[in-house]
Amino acid sequence: MIAPLLCILSYNFNTFAILNVYSKLTMFCTTNSLPMDLLLKQGSLKQEVESFCYQIVSESNDQKVGILQSEDKQLQPSVSKKSEGELSRVKFISNSNKITFSKKPKRRKYDESYLSFGFTYFGNRDAPHAQCVLCKKILSNSSLAPSKLRRHLETKHAAYKDKDISFFKQHLDSPENNKPPTPKIVNTDNESATEASYNVSYHIALSGEAHTIGELLIKPCAKDVVMRMFDEQYSKKIDAVQLSNSTVARRIKDLAADIEEELVCRLKICDGFSLQLDESADVSGLAVLLVFVRYRFNKSIEEDLLLCESLQSNATGEEIFNCINSFMQKHEIEWEKCVDVCSDASRAVDGKIAEAVTLIKYVAPESTSSHCLLYRHALAVKIMPTSLKNVLDQAVQIINYIKARPHQSRLLKILCEEMGAQHTALLLNTEVRWLSRGKVLVRLFELRRELLVFMDSAFRLSDCLTNSSWLLRLAYLADIFTKLNEVNLSMQGKNVTVFTVFDKMSSLLRKLEFWASSVEEENFDCFPTLSDFLTEINSTVDKDICSAIVQHLRGLRATLLKYFPVTNDNNAWVRNPFTVTVKPASLVARDYESLIDLTSDSQVKQNFSELSLNDFWSSLIQEYPSIARRAVRVLLPFATMHLCETGFSYYAATKTKYRKRLDAAPHMRIRLSNITPNIKRICDKKTQKHCSH
């Protein structure tokens, strides 16, 4: 009986374990005066001997041996957790006194010849995994067989099945293949799905699209992309992202609330802020109030949407003020920090906006009010001599005659295409100041030949297109309005200061004087359209036309001076502190001393040439707090109503006649704000995160 036992042990264990088992088992039999054969037979001591043997073997390299099975009951030896993984090697057979051992799982070795099938090894050299050098797919150790590797090559990479080993070796040695493989890990838990839902909703709000686009377009497209580039199983994970209509609406409200919370925190800690407000009506007839705020944050001056509210009752000045005041009190924002209110209502206008501004100045006594400088510019350019005004009105009538009749517009397009014209349609004229009237008149002048052929002789203004004097005046108007619109556009945009606008106006005033002097000398090089037309017809400008042009230019300059008067600017030190040699009247002695220290700093001087005016003074708050805060207070007021005008354009594009019931305020908060929502923070506040079903 001992010989078979030793034979079994020698098959499964090392020599040290065999000797250890045999010696201790012999000692056990001698101590108890029992023959060993008796222990190995069925009997009362059998279980004790088996436990003893298991203990001995467990102490020897954590190996296990099973001894004898009872005909009546199968034994379950107790072993340590460390060795449970190898217990499968021992098989107990009932109705037999024999013991059997299953073989160890076979560990295949990697052979260099496997590279001919496009496979290298990955992981432990003693128990490697097979890795395809083409697709980087990792196979188990059991796949390290030529037949399985060849099958992968022929099914997955049939185009390379006839390549020799040198091809795969070159592919293996490339830099891309030397990078460690990155496992494909797709996190499909509810938290990740929720964050993805917020990200998609954020982009939907930024684009102004309908909420249904998430479920109807974005999710199917995302699934198609993932399925084509990765695998179908990963594509199915996208179904967990919640993008239904109602879910996207809730997500957008959460994002807007987070942005509002961040904005309120910034306003509470800032030194001061200015407001810009305007009111308009939406597609459903509601009065919509937009209020923007300008404030210093960190080392820059920021502009954000303060509120977008629908006025349910009468849109009076008191109602507008109550709406703003309610927001300020709700969030505990101090009115004392308000330094200026910009609107489209001048002091001479007695309207609801003007009334609201007056009420704001009552609760914020130190604040000032300003009139949009673009409005001043628009009012100034409307004044012109009668002869030029008549030409402008007639040009608008010709354009409207074509644009108001779709059939006429189609016929004109066909005619322009046949005549090889650069353009095929006229531009519709509008009185809105930020659209270019210059482009409208230039287009009309460029299509004058096509219009002459197209116009019916019965139309009373058709003779204007053959009148050279009329065309000369039209050419001049096209040029001057193009120049004025360029100035108008240069004053629009974010972070435009009062200094920027007055610099543009100063430049325009000097140009107007120069243009008037040039026309008096019959030099029309400043007006390219007029100059080219004179060359084309080989003619000169009549005295009365020259007189009208000079009168218009000089009158325009005088009107601009009325709306933009040249005054002694006590805040010139803000524009360029390094040119100040005398104490400005607006500064006290201590502030002027701080200004001297500032201008004597070489590093500050270098920063002045590299940074914008807003960023320059904002960056000096820590080092020169007193003088820097005074400068920032001068820079805070809005110069134009550009943000409100842009905001209403976005509002009209978001809340269309097909979405009249939409609450557009959260969309405007996201679309018109420079603050990016903290999606991680929003998700952390959610106690439950559900995936899509």
Curated annotation (Swiss-Prot):
Residues given in the record as Zn(2+) binding sites: 132, 135, 152, 157
Domain of life, per lineage: Eukaryota
UniProt keywords, alphabetically: Metal-binding, Zinc, Zinc-finger
SUPFAM superfamilies in the record: Ribonuclease H-like
InterPro entries in alphabetical order: RNaseH-like_sf, Znf_BED
Record-linked Pfam families: zf-BED
Residues in BED-type zinc fingers: 108-164
Molecular functions (GO terms): DNA binding; zinc ion binding
Misc. remarks from the entry: May be derived from an ancient transposon that has lost its ability to translocate.
UniProt name for this protein: Zinc finger BED domain-containing protein 5
